[in-house]
Design a protein with these regions (language model features):
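Thiamine diphosphate
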Residues: 1-157
């Protein structure tokens, strides 16, 4: 991810004290920088996407706005039940960010292909689905999404 993307994440944390960043394993490559600056608002869940999504829903019920970063294939498939029951149905204000969508991580094998994440999330009518084509578009969407109390999924191939 680019410097511009990291700056975008830092701005989200700086501008809104109710935002948190939850990340699974290596979804955010500069995770340690964010965690050093915001140790109580940036949490690494390791390879535990399902627990991370349920935790995010709990935070949302307390008025927080969690941004949940995960490798798209694992975030959408391993945690789909939690996304459905904990985020979509109660309309929890959770922002799901599927990183490295499509075949971006093809070097790691077909388990890392996220070619059906849109189809899965698209079955959940309560979740707004975005596929930004640029960091500028992502910035606009994140800024607007902070004012909307509903779940979202961002499919990123940036």
């Amino acid at each position: 991810m680019s410097f511009k993307f990291h700056k975008l994440i830092l701005n989200i944390l700086k501008q809104n004290p109710n935002t948190l960043i939850l990340s699974s394993d290596n979804a955010l490559r500069e995770f340690s920088v964010f965690q050093a600056l915001f140790p109580k608002r940036v949490i690494n869940f390791g390879i535990s996407e399902a627990n991370m999504v349920s935790y995010a829903a709990g935070l949302s019920s307390c008025g927080k706005i969690p941004f949940v970063f995960g490798i798209a294939s694992f975030l959408t498939m391993r945690a789909f039940e939690q996304i459905r029951y904990d985020v979509a149905i109660p309309k929890s204000n959770v922002k799901l960010i599927g990183m490295d969508a499509g075949c971006s991580l093809s070097g790691f094998g077909n388990s890392h292909y996220a070619i059906n994440d849109i189809a899965l999330i698209g079955t959940l009518k309560q979740i707004r689905l975005f596929c930004p084509a640029s960091l500028d578009e992502l910035h606009s969407l994140f800024t607007e999404d902070l004012t909307v109390d509903s779940p979202s999924y961002y499919r990123l191939q940036l």
